[in-house]
Amino acid sequence: MGDVILSPVSTEKTALLAEKENKLTLIVDRKATKEDIKREVESRFSVKVEGINILITKKGKKAIVKLAKEYSAEEIAERIGVF
C-alpha cells in the first residue's frame, strides 16, 4: 500500500472500531512516525486525522487512526478492501 502504510488490519475488533469510534487500523513501517502516518493517511484517503495511537507488536507496528467526524472510517475501510 505504499512506503509508510503496509496493509490494513481486518478483524472483528477493527470492524467495530471503524463502526463505533471512526478509527482505521493499519500495519505501518516500523520506522514511521505519527507525523509520517498522518501525512500518508490524509493524502492517500483525502481525510482529516484527529489522532493516532501506536502499538508495537511481534508482527510489526500497528497504527490506530481516528478520523474527523465528517469522514467515515467504514467507507474508507470498504474502499481499501478491509470488509
Curated annotation (Swiss-Prot):
Query: Can you tell which superkingdom this protein's organism belongs to?
Result: Archaea
Q: Which GO terms describe its molecular function?
A: rRNA binding; structural constituent of ribosome
Please give the biological process terms from Gene Ontology that the record holds. Answer: translation
Q: Name one GO cellular component term.
A: ribonucleoprotein complex
Pfam family for this entry, one: Ribosomal_L23
Question: Which Gene3D superfamilies does the entry mention?
Answer: 3.30.70.330
- Give UniProt keywords alphabetically: Ribonucleoprotein, Ribosomal protein, RNA-binding, rRNA-binding
- Quaternary data: Part of the 50S ribosomal subunit. Contacts protein L29.
**Functional summary from the UniProt entry:** Binds to 23S rRNA. One of the proteins that surrounds the polypeptide exit tunnel on the outside of the ribosome.
List the HAMAP family.
Answer: Ribosomal_uL23_A
**Protein family per UniProt:** Belongs to the universal ribosomal protein uL23 family.
Protein name per its UniProtKB record: Large ribosomal subunit protein uL23
Species, as recorded: Thermoplasma volcanium (strain ATCC 51530 / DSM 4299 / JCM 9571 / NBRC 15438 / GSS1)
